Amino acid sequence: MFDIQYKQDIGIGQLKLGMTSDELENALLQMKKQWSNSSDEAMQMECCAETDDPNLITGRYMDNDLFFLVQYRNGKATEIVIQRDLSKVASIKLFGMDMFNTTAECIIDSLMKKDNVICNEKDLQLGTEYIFPEIGVRLWRERAFHPKLLKDPLYMEEMQAVLEDEYQYQYFQMITIIG
């Protein structure tokens, strides 16, 4: 299990904001050794500039099971992104909540008691991106799904063929730790 730390020492497990790429890569390899379900495959690591800003570098760390994305500014990690697949080998918790196995609605309601939320939709239950600036976390899902949509006949008609797949969008797919 890895807890998301906030305020002092913001990070996920041993991965901390403010680390250099070398420090973060070493910490990631140490964490990977702890995951009994993780493959023995070597982790691919690459860093590249994706914008015109020479001080902003994106690091990608991946193997068959896992994917991490890290933004570095001036050589220090400023964002750490983890995907849902990590929950196959580690439990990711914030304030005691399992961030990938608790519904988005429960997570949002709980975090709103601790911080203001910035959401890309007026209806908080149907947003895809949520930012909690004081806590230092951004939550994302590809599409929004809430059981209230099942009461909408037009939604039911349009989504009938893929309705079972839609249930996965009750959960977040990516969590970003931001400084």
Which sequence ranges carry the predicted segments?
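Hydrophobic/aromatic-rich structural module bridging two neighboring secondary-structure elements via a short loop
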Residues: E50-R73
